């Protein structure tokens, strides 16, 4: 027998439930009505612990509230077990009040409530002293009630929720089941003291169970381990010495890329806007709205360079009350606009108007966010922009209007932006993966063959890979820190793999793949299995109330 003595239990009327988990990772349930002939049988009902958490207390007052569901944790699990410390918890508002299992459509809970005050026991009403209530509720209505004396359950030790037939166990005993199978959507224990409560969330796996006279005496889990793969494929746990071919369909969960270059530089496009003097521009005729706009340039997303080289022949005019530039919302000059500034929107226009008030009034009347004034010693042909000065003549100047909002869609630059992407070759070994090797994609089982790579002639992909007859990659090379490393791409499924059984135990695997840690054996490789997953026998009693982990 490959895996001796996982459990030995006799079930009289219920599913068996593991109550105290210890450090183990599995529990096995099956119905007492499941009485197959003697021998090995593939059967559901094994649950693997995938998450463990604890909770000290969740009652904020001096006591918890009995006869009600006050605390719940959300799950999406095949099974959830909630266990108290080994001594259990008292049926008292000073310690334990309510535990429940939520199967989405209905809730099963256990509680106590010996109180007659108004508002007490909202779900159950008064429960007799020294009794507990096991109930099921759907759409706020109770459809199942069972009152039990505490002599049967002196303390609360565990409540377990199982999707199979929506089974619920109190202290290891089946106390509720239905003809539906639903995952656990929520569960919880409302308590004040006596904890902590341990929550163990589980997923369902198949199991191969060995029955004698209707009793499961041994269990091998179909969990992807070597023992599980062999036993569940051959539907038995008894193997004589020899070689046993097997198949294992690989589920691809990982991807990796092998790059030709350790880094790649990408130069992003830089859009240039070049402005020039408008020699035949007409002066305004009074007011800022008569200032004509020229060479309007609006930036979209990306990188931009604004070329104002023609301004070298103009004289910048500082802001002086009504005179000159006006750009308090722009903390830059046009000479520095390309210094890596960020904008959400940006538009630039040229205009010719009075240096006296032209900029300030343009900003006040929302023609621009900022305005920069430049003198070219122009004639006094521009009209005023203030009421009472609309017919007066003033010196004409160049006005540069900037309309902008701050953000990160647009960046100004003096030079094109170069983005450097650093590539790291993290190669996943000894499992089936999706790969992209030098641009060639596929699925494979990657092994390191550096120690065996001698005098390979690399032809494809710049001398970096050998291709097989189909054009797929067979062997590829990667530059490592200490030299070249060679890797072989094998099919995910090895049709030649065999388990090796010796002395009735699974001791190794023969494979055609050179996996990490394998030993060459003629034209194959041998992988030694050092420790099989061995479990010791569980105790036997005439009336099983719980099946603790060993």
Curated annotation (Swiss-Prot):
Q: Which residues are glycosylated?
A: 23, 74, 102, 139, 145, 164, 179, 213, 238, 248, 265, 272, 277, 307, 426, 448, 514, 531, 543
Q: Does the keyword Signal apply?
A: yes
Q: To which protein family does this belong?
A: Belongs to the coronaviruses spike protein family.
Cite the InterPro entries for this sequence.
CoV_S1_C
Q: Cellular component GO terms, alphabetically?
A: host cell endoplasmic reticulum-Golgi intermediate compartment membrane; membrane; viral envelope; virion membrane
This protein's source sits in the domain of life called Viruses
Subunit description: Homotrimer; each monomer consists of a S1 and a S2 subunit. The resulting peplomers protrude from the virus surface as spikes.
| Post-translational modification remark | Specific enzymatic cleavages in vivo yield mature proteins. The precursor is processed into S1 and S2 by host cell furin or furin-like protease to yield the mature S1 and S2 proteins. The cleavage site between S1 and S2 requires the optimal sequence [KR]-X-[KR]-R. Cleavage is not necessary for virus-cell fusion.
What would be one Pfam family of this protein? CoV_S1_C
Species this chain originates from: Avian infectious bronchitis virus (strain D3896)
Annotated site, Cleavage, chain positions: 538-539
> Which segments sit on the Extracellular face?
19-550
Is Nucleotidyltransferase one of the keywords UniProt gives this record? no
Q: What does this protein do?
A: S1 attaches the virion to the cell membrane by interacting with cell receptors, initiating the infection.
Signal sequence range: 1-18
Q: What is this protein called?
A: Spike glycoprotein
**Gene Ontology biological process terms in this record:** endocytosis involved in viral entry into host cell; fusion of virus membrane with host endosome membrane; virion attachment to host cell
Q: What are the entry keywords?
A: Cleavage on pair of basic residues, Coiled coil, Fusion of virus membrane with host endosomal membrane, Fusion of virus membrane with host membrane, Glycoprotein, Host membrane, Host-virus interaction, Membrane, Signal, Viral attachment to host cell, Viral envelope protein, Viral penetration into host cytoplasm, Virion, Virulence, Virus endocytosis by host, Virus entry into host cell
